C-alpha cells in the first residue's frame, strides 16, 4: 500500500507544479507565500527523486550570496520542519540539508560569483533561483545548459521566484513573457496566500490609510 500525503500550497500554484515543464515560477510581492511554497516543493521534489532511486543535487541559487546567511537555506529548513514526513526523510545540519538515504543533497550558490563553478557541481536535478529579479541574462544563459539531466518520466528543471520591479529584467523577458507551453509562470500576491500573516495585514491596512498613493 502506497501512503499519500497532502502538500499545502496556495491553490494558484497547483497548476504550476502539475504536468511536465522545463521552467516553473511565480512572481509577486511579500506575503504571497511564493518563497516558502517553492522551498517546500523543492524538498518534496527531492523526496520524490530519492524514493525513486534517483540521486543528485537540488541547487538553490540567488544572484547575490556572500555566505549561507544570504541563501535560501533557512527557508528550505523551515519548509522541511513544517512537514513531519519531510523531516523524517532529511537530515538537517547548521550548514547542510541532505537525505538520510544519501541520494539527495541541497547546494547553495550565488550566481554573480559562482556561476562558472555551477557547471561542475555534478548531477543537478533541479535549480531553484529565488529573488531572481536581478539575475542577468548572461547568468541564465550559463545556468540553463547545466540542467540537462533526464530519465524515464523526468528531466531537470529550472524554478524561478521573484518580486517584479522591471519589465526589462531578464527573468521577465525570458520566462514571464515566454509563449512556450513548457514554461509555467503565475502572478501571486497576498490575496492568494490563505495563511497571509496577521502582522503583514496590519501593515497593509496602515499603508492604505497613511500612504494611500
Question: Where on the chain are the PLM-derived regions?
Answer:
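Phosphate/NTP-binding elements of NTP-utilizing enzymes
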Residues: 1-213
Amino acid at each position: 500500500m502506497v501512503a499519500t500525503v497532502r502538500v499545502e500550497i496556495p491553490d494558484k500554484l497547483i497548476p504550476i507544479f502539475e504536468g511536465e515543464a522545463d521552467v516553473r515560477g511565480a512572481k509577486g510581492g511579500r506575503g504571497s507565500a511564493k518563497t516558502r511554497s517553492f522551498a517546500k516543493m523543492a524538498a518534496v521534489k527531492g523526496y520524490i527523486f530519492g524514493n525513486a532511486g534517483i540521486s543528485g543535487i537540488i541547487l538553490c541559487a540567488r544572484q547575490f550570496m556572500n555566505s549561507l546567511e544570504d541563501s535560501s537555506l533557512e527557508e528550505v529548513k523551515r519548509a522541511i520542519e513544517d512537514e513531519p514526513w519531510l523531516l523524517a526523510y532529511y537530515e538537517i545540519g547548521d550548514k547542510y540539508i541532505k537525505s538520510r538515504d544519501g541520494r539527495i543533497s541541497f547546494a547553495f550558490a550565488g550566481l554573480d560569483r559562482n556561476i562558472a563553478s555551477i557547471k561542475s557541481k555534478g548531477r543537478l536535478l533541479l535549480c531553484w533561483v529565488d529573488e531572481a529579479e536581478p539575475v542577468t541574462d548572461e547568468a541564465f544563459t550559463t545556468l540553463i545548459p547545466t540542467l540537462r539531466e533526464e530519465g524515464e518520466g523526468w528531466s531537470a528543471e529550472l524554478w524561478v521566484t521573484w518580486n517584479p520591479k522591471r519589465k526589462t529584467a531578464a527573468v521577465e523577458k525570458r520566462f514571464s513573457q515566454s509563449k512556450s507551453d513548457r514554461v509555467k509562470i503565475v502572478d501571486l500576491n497576498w490575496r492568494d496566500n490563505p495563511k497571509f500573516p496577521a502582522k503583514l495585514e496590519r501593515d497593509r491596512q496602515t499603508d492604505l490609510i497613511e500612504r494611500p498613493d
